[in-house]
């Protein structure tokens, strides 16, 4: 089992527990916004992610940093959940837990998340066309695009929906051609 699968398996019950709490407190939307914010901050701050994953840092130090970083930006429920993660030494998985929570919350709302990587920025017409195609593909009522620009794709785009990846990029086609040439050379 790869380490990513192991982390995802460990993260799942925490994400489910947070969703149960959010549902019980009627705060799914608020906690979803909190989790999006946390994911964005962790994505932007490698130092914070490294600090939280560092086993040499004390639980108290991690709690202080979390309170200082997120305290006034997230709900009390979410902050309490983060403190539980610190106590249980699972705070290093925060980005994965947040992602799993969002997947579960969106599935509950019948919302599909599509991670799109493009070589250039998409205009609104292209985004709407992609949303329509993804709705037809997945039978989802709502589709949310998470778009990132990756010039290394050279051209085209990749779409990731859950574990399914559709790669129409030139980089992907070049890799596929190289793979076929390697096989043919043997």
Swiss-Prot record:
Signal peptide: none annotated. One of its GO terms (molecular function) is proton-transporting ATP synthase activity, rotational mechanism. Its main location: plastid. It holds the Pfam family OSCP. It is found in: Plastid, Chloroplast thylakoid membrane. PROSITE patterns: ATPASE_DELTA (PS00389). The keyword Disulfide bond does not apply. It comes from the Eukaryota. It is a peripheral membrane protein. Keywords: ATP synthesis, CF(1), Chloroplast, Hydrogen ion transport, Ion transport, Membrane, Plastid, Thylakoid, Transport. F(1)F(0) ATP synthase produces ATP from ADP in the presence of a proton or sodium gradient. F-type ATPases consist of two structural domains, F(1) containing the extramembraneous catalytic core and F(0) containing the membrane proton channel, linked together by a central stalk and a peripheral stalk. During catalysis, ATP synthesis in the catalytic domain of F(1) is coupled via a rotary mechanism of the central stalk subunits to proton translocation. This protein is part of the stalk that links CF(0) to CF(1). It either transmits conformational changes from CF(0) to CF(1) or is implicated in proton conduction. F-type ATPases have 2 components, F(1) - the catalytic core - and F(0) - the membrane proton channel. F(1) has five subunits: alpha(3), beta(3), gamma(1), delta(1), epsilon(1). CF(0) has four main subunits: a(1), b(1), b'(1) and c(10-14). The alpha and beta chains form an alternating ring which encloses part of the gamma chain. F(1) is attached to F(0) by a central stalk formed by the gamma and epsilon chains, while a peripheral stalk is formed by the delta, b and b' chains. Belongs to the ATPase delta chain family. HAMAP family: ATP_synth_delta_bact. This is ATP synthase subunit delta, chloroplastic. It comes from Porphyra purpurea (Red seaweed). The lineage of its organism: Eukaryota, Rhodophyta, Bangiophyceae, Bangiales, Bangiaceae.
């Amino acid at each position: 089992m790869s380490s990513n699968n192991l982390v995802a398996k460990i993260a799942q019950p925490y994400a489910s527990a947070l969703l149960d709490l959010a549902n019980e407190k009627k705060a799914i939307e608020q906690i979803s916004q909190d989790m999006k914010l946390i994911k964005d901050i962790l994505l932007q701050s490698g130092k914070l992610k490294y600090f939280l994953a560092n086993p040499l840092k004390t639980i108290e130090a991690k709690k202080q940093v979390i309170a200082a970083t997120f305290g006034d930006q997230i709900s009390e429920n979410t902050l309490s959940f983060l403190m539980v993660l610190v106590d249980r030494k699972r705070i290093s998985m925060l980005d994965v837990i947040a992602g799993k929570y969002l997947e579960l919350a969106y599935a509950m709302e019948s919302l599909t998340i599509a991670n799109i990587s493009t070589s250039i920025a998409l205009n609104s017409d292209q985004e709407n066309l992609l949303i329509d195609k993804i709705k037809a593909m997945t039978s989802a009522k709502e589709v949310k695009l998470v778009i990132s620009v990756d010039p290394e794709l050279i051209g085209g785009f990749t779409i990731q929906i859950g574990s399914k990846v559709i790669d129409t990029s030139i980089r992907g086609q070049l890799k596929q051609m190289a793979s076929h040439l390697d096989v043919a050379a043997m």
